[in-house]
Amino acid sequence: MSQEKKYVITYKGVKKLEEELEYLKTTKRKEITEKIKVALSFGDLSENSEYDEAKNDQAFVEGRIAQIENMLKNANVIDESELKNDVVSVGSKVMVKDYQFDEEIEFSIVGSAEADPIENKISNESPVGSALIGKKVGDEIEVNVPDGVDKYKILAIK
C-alpha cells in the first residue's frame, strides 16, 4: 500500500485552498451545470461543441476539487509563529542577493501546494528552495540551472 504524499503548507495556504474549494464546489459547479443544460437543449450531442466544452470544464473542475481535498486531507500545516529566524525553513521569508542580476530578492519558502513564482513564493522542493532550507544569514548557495549556475547570498531571514 502506497503512502499518501504529505503537503507542507502554511495556515495562509490552507485558507486559500479552502476558499478555492468552496468557490469550485458552489459557484463553478453551478455555472458548469447550467452550461451543460443549455448545451443539451441544442439537441444532437455528436456535433455539439458547447456540450463537449462544458463536459471538459466539468472534468477539470472535479479533478481540481479532488486534488485540493487530497492536499487538505494530507496537509502538514506549518505554524509560522513558531518559526525561528536563524535558519531558513518552510514559512520563512528570505532576502537574498542574486549575483547573476546583482539585485536583492525576497522569497517566501512554501510547500509545493502553495508555490507561486509570480508572488516569489517558491517551493521547498524547488532547486532554489531546497538549497536555501537549513541555511543561515551570510551563507551562499549555488543552484544548477539549465544555463549554468545561479549564486545567491542570504541577507536576512524573517
UniProtKB/Swiss-Prot annotation:
PROSITE patterns: GREAB_1, GREAB_2. Residues 14-76 form a coiled coil. GO terms for molecular function: DNA binding; RNA polymerase binding. InterPro entries: GreA/GreB_C_sf, TF_GreA/GreB_CS, Tscrpt_elong_fac_GreA, Tscrpt_elong_fac_GreA/B, Tscrpt_elong_fac_GreA/B_C, Tscrpt_elong_fac_GreA/B_fam, Tscrpt_elong_fac_GreA/B_N, Tscrpt_elong_fac_GreA/B_N_sf. Keywords: Coiled coil, DNA-binding, Transcription, Transcription regulation. GO terms for biological process: DNA-templated transcription elongation; regulation of DNA-templated transcription elongation. Transmembrane segments: none annotated. Pfam families: GreA_GreB (PF01272), GreA_GreB_N (PF03449). It comes from the Bacteria. Belongs to the GreA/GreB family. Necessary for efficient RNA polymerase transcription elongation past template-encoded arresting sites. The arresting sites in DNA have the property of trapping a certain fraction of elongating RNA polymerases that pass through, resulting in locked ternary complexes. Cleavage of the nascent transcript by cleavage factors such as GreA or GreB allows the resumption of elongation from the new 3'terminus. GreA releases sequences of 2 to 3 nucleotides. PANTHER family: TRANSCRIPTION ELONGATION FACTOR GREA. This is Transcription elongation factor GreA. It comes from Clostridium acetobutylicum (strain ATCC 824 / DSM 792 / JCM 1419 / IAM 19013 / LMG 5710 / NBRC 13948 / NRRL B-527 / VKM B-1787 / 2291 / W).
